[in-house]
Amino acid sequence: MTYEYDIIVVGGGHAGCEAAAAAAKLGAQTLLITMDMGKFANMSCNPAVGGVAKGQIVREIDALGGRTARITDRTTLQFRMLNRSKGAAMWSPRAQCDKGRFSAEWRHELENTQNLYIWQDTAAELLFDTAGERPRVTGVRTYMGVEFTARAVILTAGTFLDGMMYCGEAHAPGGRAGDPASTGITASLAAMGFETGRMKTGTPARLDARTIDFEALEPQYGDENPSKLSFSTDTQSVKHQSPCFLVYTSPEVHATLRTGFDRSPLFNGTIHGIGPRYCPSIEDKLRTFADKEQHQLFLEPEGDNTNEYYLNGFSSSLPWEVQYEALHRIRGLEDVHIFRPGYAIEYDYFPPTQLRHTLETKLVDGLYFAGQVNGTTGYEEAAAQGLLAGINAHRKRVGESAIVLQRDEAYIGVLIDDLVTKGVDEPYRMFTSRAEYRILLRQDNADLRLTPLGHEIGLISEKDFANFERKKSCVESLISFARRTSVRAGEIDDYLKSVDSEPMKQGRKLYDILLRNEIAFAGLSRVLPKLAQLIEEKGMTTEAIEEAEIQIKYNGYIQREKFIAEKLHRLENIAIPADFDYHSMQSLTIEARQKLTRIRPTTIGQASRIPGVSPADVNVLLVKFGR
């Protein structure tokens, strides 16, 4: 057996799977160490992928050559495009998944990836060489005493580092229910000088479908014409969808839950870690929104071949018997059987300001962090970090330049820049509001933004790149056709009337007609034979047609955001020396000197985004390093 590898990935969650798959596909001899080969990319919380901003991230992962979207498409139970009633920048794909099949598909993917090897064990300690000018990672020692060496190590340990689970007054060490915690790694990193902290997350009870009165619940169906998450033609949209169900709490439910507040580890000081602001427990909701008489919950199926349902919105660490009594007071759940109660978990993380934009640590060469160890929450955020860490660990090994996505290039770029530049004081999740350029960063154009880069890196196959080029050509052809084609007055009046649009009093270019919100290529193709002929001859897909339409309707906004982004790029091109002494610049505020010294931004653009660095401080840096 080989004990020497190019890259070692510690942890088989969503970040670890993407990191290992990317590194191995690029040619690195990669070892993935995981506690349980049956739980790759396990959906420890809700059985879904995507959602607001998260769906955009998954499409970006796919456009770069990651695997999450493809595996999601193969295991989708229900698909919805969220925010469809809003502008295209807000559209967010979400898929309900079969969690068992999702994990099994990831296992199949990993076991059939060339250059990738798997070792089932627990990492106990990271190994370092401190003899040189800078410390570097050299490998991993496992609980079984095996030492593996590598040029790079990617830590993707999720919630397992010194994890502690809580349910009421009961508590036990663990990374999640049924799995042990990982001890030793945090200590080995703290000894190297890494700052550590504690965070908290939680999950709701799982319910038995045989004991749920679905007739009393409001069904939530998927889209009538579902799309999918991957751009690849190798996957198909879901054919047979399973519904979710909407339920509500009540004052009676709330009163029952409050009887356990004195035994809540969140409220009695047992848990010190900070929980996710945007995914609060049910007891947090009752405290924060004490005046609300009901809260919305969603029952979500966990798979085709299981009776297990996930109660989204009811995360809790209250005593199990309190959860049990409260659940039985919810309409439709009066006789429900609980497979397992909700619980909270507290775990170690490392403030991400200790990272470079490549996700390599500043303290130790060759050591990368990805996922919840960086203070994030969510499968999608973790997978994105894992993908970039895997890419960059390989590229550094072979002497190639790092891949750093900018804030106007991808939500992934926003994610990593926020982590590295601003840090976190609570579990970080992505929202569209975090992106300054969300009109540029739409879910529909993730391939146009990133697939050429994915192909250049080596993760996009020739087949997928050829399909991408065909789509791009179709989009360009359709926009060009719209620009040069004139429509006579009265020629499409019947169609305009059918969509409540004003008739044309004079001829206009098709492009200008499409600027009206209610006008679509699909409807126009029924009354303009030349348009229908073009679409048929080129075999244009619905996605290509929709992309062309969005580019036309939003062109003004798109150009404005591009202009703003180009102006700000000038700041990104002004470098700051890595060893610059900020304390020597008395014209900077004390807070700015402290923050800049701690975070060590590489450019003035990054410095400008650090909380506590004012526009006046940025001007001082511009004077020093050149405008």
Sequence positions of predicted segments:
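An anion/pyrophosphate-binding glycine-rich loop and adjacent beta-alpha core
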Residues: 36-37, 186-324, 421-494, 498-506, ...
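Conserved N-terminal/central alpha/beta ligand/cofactor-binding core
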Residues: 21-125, 144, 156-176, 180, ...
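Internal hydrophobic alpha-helix adjacent to the cofactor/substrate pocket in enzyme cavities
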Residues: 382-403
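A glycine-rich dinucleotide-binding beta-alpha-beta segment and adjacent secondary-structure elements
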Residues: 310-376, 404-417, 541-595, 600
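Core beta-strand elements of the Rossmann-like FAD/NAD(P) dinucleotide-binding domain
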Residues: 3-5, 143-152
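Extended, charge-enriched "interface" segments that sit outside catalytic cores
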Residues: 434, 440, 451-619, 623-627
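Beta1/beta-strand and adjacent pyrophosphate-binding region of the FAD-binding site
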Residues: 2-15
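Conserved beta-strand-loop-beta-strand element in the redox core of flavoprotein oxidoreductases
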Residues: 127-147
